[in-house]
Design a protein with these regions (language model features):
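Alpha-helical transmembrane segments and their immediate juxtamembrane cytosolic regions
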Residues: 1-326, 332-338
Length: 338
């Protein structure tokens, strides 16, 4: 059970990448799909309701979580926190390069905000909650969600949010109710996007839907963690940086050769699912030999000044309180994919 705690986070990160992939597929096909085809139009709107603006917040939240775990890892190795500056610099560089391929890049923003968070990373959870909540309220209007979501991810680790699922079960069940409610409000806002209130409603609904996804995924994982699909999500999550970049490369190549001009919305979804399935397969094979993905390992090399690709090892350890999501996992598995 201890190992499953971090696997939940890896699986959730992999799940978020699936949603991001589907959302980006619609974005790449925007303007190229035949709008006169009612089927195309309806499916595009359904995908927008399910994915747009609701999976990237999960990915961002987990980045904040991973940042704290990275700090803990550095401390265990008696490394100074300043090595995080090296990692952030590499992420900014990678993000800048990624921006040349995809205007929706988030890595550059993640790297820059990662620098800023170093000044408050040791603050008490109460301070982080106050700052995060204030920024979150502003983000509803400004749509600048990255910083508050980072902070909430950091707070989640510091507060051991998921320590006792049984005692908090009722809250997760209530969280699941957000899914149907916010999908309805997202649909209304998308159908009336020209109205001034629709953007505000869309931003709020998208974030609340992300919370619903997190609670639903956590509950399902808790009850059915042995299902093969969670292992696939986990492997994608452990190599999330590599897979995120590869998704962009594949989509850019497809766009350049005119693939999106000949596919309808249904075909586009199947292509996205095929890409994700291949990534699951390749990631699973790769992780049988190595502990980290290619890009993940490159960041580690620069961070720890270690140029040897280490093969997979199983050395369990315990940190702090026991907790079904966060503690007592193999060392390599605990560190951030980004």
């Amino acid at each position: 059970m201890q190992k499953e705690r971090i696997k939940t986070i890896d699986s959730l990160r992999g799940f978020s990448l699936l949603g991001i992939l589907l959302a980006n597929a619609v974005i790449y096909g925007y303007g190229l799909l035949d709008k006169s085809d009612l089927t195309n139009d309806k499916i595009e709107k359904i995908i927008k309701v399910i994915t747009e603006g609701s999976f990237m917040p999960i990915f961002t939240f987990l980045f904040g979580y991973s940042l704290i775990k990275l700090v803990e890892s550095l401390k265990r190795r008696n490394k100074q926190i300043k090595w995080l500056l090296v990692r952030r610099s590499m992420l900014i560089l990678l993000g800048a390069l990624h921006t040349t391929l995809w205007h929706g890049d988030v890595l550059l923003t993640y790297g820059i905000i990662g620098f800023l968070l170093l000044f408050i990373i040791e603050r008490k959870p109460k301070i982080l909650i106050i700052i995060g909540t204030s920024l979150f309220i502003l983000s509803i209007v400004t749509n600048a969600q990255t910083m508050p979501l980072f902070l909430f991810g950091m707070v989640a680790v510091k507060k051991n949010v998921f320590v006792c699922l049984e005692q908090e079960y009722i809250w997760y069940k209530r969280g699941i109710l957000l899914i149907p409610i916010t999908m309805i409000t997202k649909y209304i806002s998308i159908m009336n996007y020209d109205n001034s209130w629709s953007v505000l409603l869309l931003n709020i609904s998208s974030l609340l839907l992300a919370i619903g996804y997190i609670t639903a995924f956590s509950l399902i994982y808790f009850h059915f963690s042995d299902m093969k699909v969670f292992k696939w999500f986990e492997n994608i999550g452990k190599t999330s940086l590599t897979n995120y970049i590869m998704q962009t490369v594949i989509f850019v190549c497809g766009y350049r050769i005119g693939l999106f001009k000949i596919l309808d919305s249904i075909s586009l979804i199947f292509v996205a699912l095929a890409i994700f399935s291949i990534q699951c397969f390749v990631s699973s094979l790769y992780l049988k030999k190595f502990k980290y993905g290619p890009l993940e390992n490159s960041l580690r090399k620069w961070t720890y000044l270690s140029w040897k690709i280490r093969e997979r090892s199983i050395k369990p350890f315990v940190i702090g309180r026991k907790n079904w999501m966060f503690s007592n996992t193999p060392r390599g598995a605990r560190e951030s994919a980004i």
